[in-house]
Structure formats: structure tokens, C-alpha cells
Amino acid sequence: MNVPAALRYTKDHEWIQLLDDGATALVGITDFAQSELGDIVFVELKPAGTALKEHEIFGTVEAVKTVADLFAPVAGEILEVNAGLDSAETVNQDPYGSGWMVKMKLADPASVANLLDAAAYRELIGG
């Protein structure tokens, strides 16, 4: 199972990557999550401009047999949604790259440090 060391993770299986400016980040679902969901057929995300509280639902992922909510790892505002997810299978193929979900402006960039690091996330998923 792929768990990149440079990212932070939630117990709900989202990842977050701080961008170079230190105030914005990309958010997506983990390799473990996409594997557990199976073939993803549709992704619905709240639009750019939406303010989110930590743990607030920012969208859903629909797979062949289930629908899963997406939870904001930290508080902030959605700046951009990934238009490439019109092809939802991108999440299965590249969850940490072209399968990212939203770009966020973080309310408190330091809050990312409170999330799980790669070792703690691996332990959570039993890997």
C-alpha cells in the first residue's frame, strides 16, 4: 500500500499536502481508501469558495457498491476543485497525483501538524 512520507493523513483516509506557499494544500483520498472502495464511478465536490470546518463533509465518492463521504482534514476554504475528476477512475489510478480532490486555503496551516504522519497512518491501516 502506497503511503507517501511527505503527506499527512486522517483517520478517515484523506491525505493533505502543504504546497510551497505554506498556506494552501491539496486534499485527496488515500491509496488504501480507493482500494477499499473499489471502482470509483463518480466524485461530487463542494464548489470553490466553500468555507469548511475541520471534519466537515466536502464531497462524496461513489463506487460501484457504496458511497463514501469526504471529510476536510483541517479548516479552510476550497479554492479549486479538480476538474480532471470528470473521469472518476483517475482517483483509483493516481490517488496522490492527478486524483487529488480539492485545493484549499488553510485557516491555520500549523493545524496540519496535528494529523497523522505516514508511519502512524500505516499503523492505522495495518500496514
Swiss-Prot record:
Cofactor binding note: Binds 1 lipoyl cofactor covalently.
Family annotation (PROSITE patterns): BIOTINYL_LIPOYL, LIPOYL
Chain positions with N6-lipoyllysine modification: K65
UniProt key word Hydrolase: no
Cross-referenced InterPro entries: 2-oxoA_DH_lipoyl-BS, Biotin_lipoyl, GCV_H, GCV_H/Fam206, GCV_H_sub, Single_hybrid_motif
Domain of life (superkingdom): Bacteria
SUPFAM superfamilies, per database record: Single hybrid motif
Lipoyl-binding domain boundaries: 24-105
Disulfide bridges in this chain: none
Cofactor requirement: (R)-lipoate
Keywords recorded for this protein, A-Z: Lipoyl
Record's GO cellular component terms: cytoplasm; glycine cleavage complex
Function: The glycine cleavage system catalyzes the degradation of glycine. The H protein shuttles the methylamine group of glycine from the P protein to the T protein.
Family per record: Belongs to the GcvH family.
PANTHER family named among the record's database cross-references: GLYCINE CLEAVAGE SYSTEM H PROTEIN, GLYCINE CLEAVAGE SYSTEM H PROTEIN-RELATED
NCBIfam families per the UniProt record, alphabetical: gcvH (TIGR00527), PRK01202.1 (NF002270)
Record's subunit section: The glycine cleavage system is composed of four proteins: P, T, L and H.
Protein name: Glycine cleavage system H protein
Record organism: Chlorobium luteolum (strain DSM 273 / BCRC 81028 / 2530) (Pelodictyon luteolum)
